[in-house]
């Protein structure tokens, strides 16, 4: 979290060049399964690693877990901190400067006070992600025992579902505790921006900007080294003895998963993004734009935050106990793609809902008033006004659901069948079988697919934003 805070501060409070480039590189771990940083660390610092001599201890164990989880959780914390540091009132900085406050005093009184709730939210998220992740512990954990890996071994390795459920509850308790504290702090947080606030623009400072640029470049260089090594290793004949170019790791025939797993992941991501985007946006619209039954809206709004507090591993265990019951009429769904889609939508519901809800709240109520005065039916207003204005947010939701479904492993690890195995699960199985080259190749496919879809949707979102916001620009010119 401290590294992510400094990175976010550099992007928002300095004048370093190429901010979009640094931000894009820092978000790379979001596009790959959590096992990929672990695989890259093995190639870099493992027994046959390129940089093995730089470490005095083995990468397999505590320090491997720490380094892998830092890389994996960094972009998650960064996104929260970027949001926390994006809103600042320039009048507060002007007042501090007029009173002769030092840079440190201004930072402590203005910047820190307005962003400390975001820091705690990032701490809660990183804590929850770390204790519930078992992708990195599987790859570089060694003999170091973690709860998530024990739950995985209990259910799949030993068929001890009761023990797995107990460990799942232990994982749920700290996640619920941190989530509850975060909600309580959010209620006490004051608005950082008022209606009269002025947008803050940092002033040029060569020494400060140079130091932060060096820091940002070092972080991005680390990410490029890690992910570049993983991608490079997937095209190597036999690491580290034969470094000639080869595509043999992409020949997944005869291996658990293979191209079927990759195809299944694309199908899962497509249906999760398409169906989830529609259901979540419609649900957010009914909650935010329905005036009647406010108590019901508040209840539904509160329930929409529940998936954020439930780790994916616990959610997957719950689906196993419910859908795997022989007397359950829905038992036929167990192991099917339908159940994987439902679980993925539920798992990633909260973030997508918050995006849709924020977009809908930004729409002026005068739009509805104008439609009512013109006696336009609700569906026409929804299709002609709401959808076009919220289309950039819809594309962001679609991108988030697609990428998350492509990289998910925790919620789906207990729910797949041989016919519905996913690419991220195949990475896990290949690594367990000792085929780390195949695991790197599959991770590379996931990374490139997620990056390609994200770039296409980002371009589409910018184009839609220019068209839908053109009336704002004309109004400003007038």
What does each of the following model-derived ranges do?
Residues 1-86, 114-135, 164-183, 208-238, ...:
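Membrane-water interface segments at the C-terminal ends of transmembrane alpha-helices
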Residues 23-26, 90-98, 109, 153-156, ...:
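Short amphipathic alpha-helical coupling elements at transmembrane boundaries
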Residues 102, 190-204, 239-253, 377:
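Juxtamembrane inter-helical linkers in multi-pass membrane proteins
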Residues 150, 160-168, 173-174, 196-213, ...:
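Transmembrane alpha-helical segments and their membrane-interface loop/helix boundaries
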Residues 182-217, 295-297, 459-478:
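Transmembrane alpha-helical segments of polytopic membrane transport and secretion proteins
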